[in-house]
């Protein structure tokens, strides 16, 4: 994704994901900054440093209340790509640690199976509540 930094006359220059683009080779009234000599602003490097979100609901529920909370979250937001699934996939060798962070086909199958299980549990729980 690029950030467009444009002067008022809209001549358009900006920051790409890895480099600057557009602009002029010489400074002028139309281009107040010439891109080749421009440096990346200090705030431009902070995008990848944001901390991960803390989850309010445990991914490996132990108590009945935690199970209900997890199922409710799955019903609201869809099945999560659970940390538990990825850890289990690593243990069985379904996660290729040498490459970029991508699940192997076995890991994807395992994640899909876990998601299906959680959805089915939620459906069963709904049926049980309706029948009472």
From Swiss-Prot:
Site (Cleavage): 23-24
A biological process term (GO) from this entry: symbiont entry into host cell
Prosegment residue ranges: 2-23
Keywords tagged on the record: DNA-binding, Host nucleus, Host-virus interaction, Late protein, Phosphoprotein, Viral penetration into host nucleus, Virion, Virus entry into host cell
UniProt GO molecular function: DNA binding
Induction statement: Expressed in the late phase of the viral replicative cycle.
Cellular component, GO, one term: host cell nucleolus
PTM info: Cleaved near the N-terminus by the viral protease during virion maturation to form the mature protein.
A Pfam short name: Adeno_VII
Motif, Nuclear localization signal: chain positions: 124-132
Chain ranges passing through the membrane: none
Family designation: Belongs to the adenoviridae histone-like nucleoprotein family.
Function: Plays a role in the inhibition of host immune response within the nucleus. Interacts with cellular nucleosomes and immobilizes the host immune danger signal HMGB1 on chromatin. In turn, prevents HMGB1 release out of the cell and thus decreases inflammation. Also plays a role in the wrapping and condensation of the viral DNA. May also promote viral genome import into the nucleus.
HAMAP family for this protein: ADV_PVII
UniProt miscellaneous comment: All late proteins expressed from the major late promoter are produced by alternative splicing and alternative polyadenylation of the same gene giving rise to non-overlapping ORFs. A leader sequence is present in the N-terminus of all these mRNAs and is recognized by the viral shutoff protein to provide expression although conventional translation via ribosome scanning from the cap has been shut off in the host cell.
Subunit structure and binding partners: Interacts with the core-capsid bridging protein; this interaction bridges the virus core to the capsid. Interacts with host NPM1; this interaction might play a role in placing the pre-histone-like nucleoprotein on the viral DNA or regulating viral gene expression. Interacts with host HMGB1; this interaction inhibits host immune response.
Protein name: Pre-histone-like nucleoprotein
Biological source species: Canine adenovirus serotype 1 (strain Utrecht) (CAdV-1)
Source lineage: Viruses, Varidnaviria, Bamfordvirae, Preplasmiviricota, Tectiliviricetes
Record gene name: L2
């Amino acid at each position: 994704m690029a950030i467009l930094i444009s002067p008022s006359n809209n001549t358009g220059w900006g920051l790409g994901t890895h480099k600057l683009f557009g602009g002029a080779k010489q400074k002028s009234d139309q281009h107040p900054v010439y891109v080749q000599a421009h440096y990346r602003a200090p705030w431009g490097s902070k995008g990848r440093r944001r901390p991960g979100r803390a989850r309010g609901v445990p991914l490996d529920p132990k108590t009945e209340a935690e199970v209900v909370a997890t199922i409710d979250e799955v019903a609201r937001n869809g099945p999560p790509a659970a940390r538990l699934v990825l850890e289990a996939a690593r243990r069985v060798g379904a996660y290729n640690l040498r490459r970029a962070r991508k699940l192997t086909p076995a890991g994807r199958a395992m994640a899909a199976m876990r998601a299906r299980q959680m959805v089915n549990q939620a459906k069963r729980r709904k049926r049980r509540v309706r029948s009472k």
